[in-house]
Amino acid sequence: MILEIAQIDVKPGLEAEFEAGIAKAAAIFKSAKGCRSFAVRRSIEKPQRYRLLIEWETLENHTVDFTGSQAWKDYRAMVSPCFEGPPSVEHTELALQAF
């Protein structure tokens, strides 16, 4: 299992628009090959900063299957007008789950 962490800074005043768009985009992720879960967190210290936490079965499910699809283009069309700049994306694997 791979956890994608995407950090997105949203343009000032577009937080509600971004949240509405990302809520609609959840359906796209739900039907994406290998996507296991999708959550969005908003920073308390920096309210214009969001982190998408997306679990994929494999790295390729994200980097090949999803980003090469029309679904990815549809997702980006819903939310990218709200982006302050390009998202920062990192893929992680579980090293320890203590409890």
Question: Which positions does each model-derived feature cover?
Answer:
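Glycine-rich beta-strand-turn "strand-cap" elements at beta-sheet edges
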Residues: I2, A39-R51, R76-F99
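Active-site-flanking beta-strand signature of metal-NTP-handling nucleotidyl enzymes
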Residues: L3-I8
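Residue-level signal for secondary-structure boundary sites
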Residues: A16, E60-H62, Q97-F99
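Short hydrophobic/aromatic beta-strand micro-patches
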Residues: D9, R41, L53-E55
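Short, surface-exposed ligand-recognition loops at beta-strand->loop->(often short) alpha-helix junctions
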Residues: V10-F18
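An amphipathic, aromatic/His-enriched active-site/gating alpha helix that lines ligand/cofactor pockets
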Residues: K24-R36, E55-E90
